[in-house]
Amino acid sequence: MTRTDIITELETDHRVIEALFTWIHRTPIEDTGRERLLQEAAGELARHAAAQERYLYPAVRSCLPGGDGFVEKENAGQERLTAMLRGLESCTVLEPGFDGRVRALEREVTQHIRHEEHDLFPTLRQGCPPETLQRLGAQVREDRARDRAVAGGSAATVRSVLAGGGAV
């Protein structure tokens, strides 16, 4: 298996989260499986945020001029996502507005992904030594390996496919 840096690890998170939203929208509106998929997406978002907080943001602060500003902007976006997820926790798929709230969350997540992949990640790749990014990627993988030992679910299937391990 090819070892990747932290940026590639976080980009893989993005693809997994996008796939989960696609599955949510392809599942019939009245199907309670949508709630399970949303819970998985929320879990993936939480793991992604934890990896950013623990590994990415310290690297941004130390490697980039103005890194604190990047991190503050990311934290503000994360607070919006957290508030939206909390608003969905008490909803069921049968409640009016559930689908609209999920789509609003997806739009916010998509904006977060675009910002990271078009602004933050290229800047970090230029400003941070490759060996640092590799080391941080290894640390993220170690954390995730522990998490996956108990997780499973659709997100694990998507990760396996992205790693070349099978088809969805």
Question: Could you say what each language-model-derived stretch is?
Answer:
Residues 1-168:
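Small-residue-biased structural context
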